[in-house]
Amino acid sequence: MTMMKRCAYFRLLSALMPMAVAAVLMTACATTAETRERRAAEQQRIAQAVEEIVASGDFTVEMNYVNPQRMRSKMLTGEYGVTVKGDSIDSYLPFFGRVYRAEFGIQTGLRFEDKIAQRQVKRARKDYYEVDLVVKRHMEHLFYSFDIYDNGKVTLMVRSDNRDTMHFSGDLVIE
């Protein structure tokens, strides 16, 4: 290739390079905008599903993490969770901590099925609901306080008059 052809080639390349870069950037921005719109639509769909589930009063939460009062946070392995259906609760949660007054022969953690004595549901802020439940079991009252966020994430605080407080986090089961 002669020097003259090489110079013409580089001039052509330098003239086309900004257009190629602009085309790539425009494609990337269009893809990003499309992805952003798709993500917003998915978030809206999940928020709508969460609203319907909370309004129905029947929900299942799968727990991923536990934060005991006297220990470090732990990732939960296994099928831990809580199911609320009508006026009953099915709790399958571990308990780590101090028990102040225990029944003899019953070492089940927070694993039980029972009736809900009280229920209160409210929209706390624009991005989450508070669902508070009271369960009266044998010698203790358990207070389950769920914060159910529009993105399907859930935090749960379990308080008792006979045990340390436990905090859990997990995901709302959306079918």
Residue map of PLM features:
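C-terminal motif of bacterial Sec signal peptides marking the signal peptidase cleavage site
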Residues: 25-28
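N-terminal secretory signal peptides
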Residues: 35, 40-101
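Helix-rich interaction surfaces within compact, conserved domain-sized segments
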Residues: 115-175
